[in-house]
Amino acid sequence: KSTTLAGMIDYLNNTFEGHILTIEDPVEFVHKSKKCLVNQRELGVHTLSFANALRAALREDPDIILVGEMRDLDTIQLALTAAETGHLVFATLHTSSAPKTIDRIIDAFPPNQQAQVRAQLSETLEAVLTQTLLKKRSGGRVAAVEIMVGTTAVRNLIREGKLHQIPGI
């Protein structure tokens, strides 16, 4: 997961002009500014929590935000707010499938907020990428990747709370 995110950040840094802000625990790959200004924040060094760093990030107005891990409700809520306000947000969450990722985000919120969160996700979600390492018969491991793109159909199912239908699309 770290290598995949580092590759995505490197691609954006080489391809687009803008401001990239990463919030990580720990910083695993150091990104030098190329076409983008890259600022990297590390938990325990530059900030006390992902949520605190995200609050500060929204004042810095980055174009792209990488959240190393969405561990709590506050962080998830702030990541959604950042996406709603036009930031491209990359974040990690430990789940086993794309629909379960959406479930986990929604379930982090109290029941009375879940309809609103489904609406937010349906408006902002671009994609979910799920990775797992599978054992090879010959030894070693190989990456298996699931990609769910935020198509109109996927967005509608998220909004309507019909996540169980996503694998059928």
Model-derived segments and their meaning:
Residues K1-I169:
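Short, flexible helix-loop junctions that flank or precede catalytic/ligand sites
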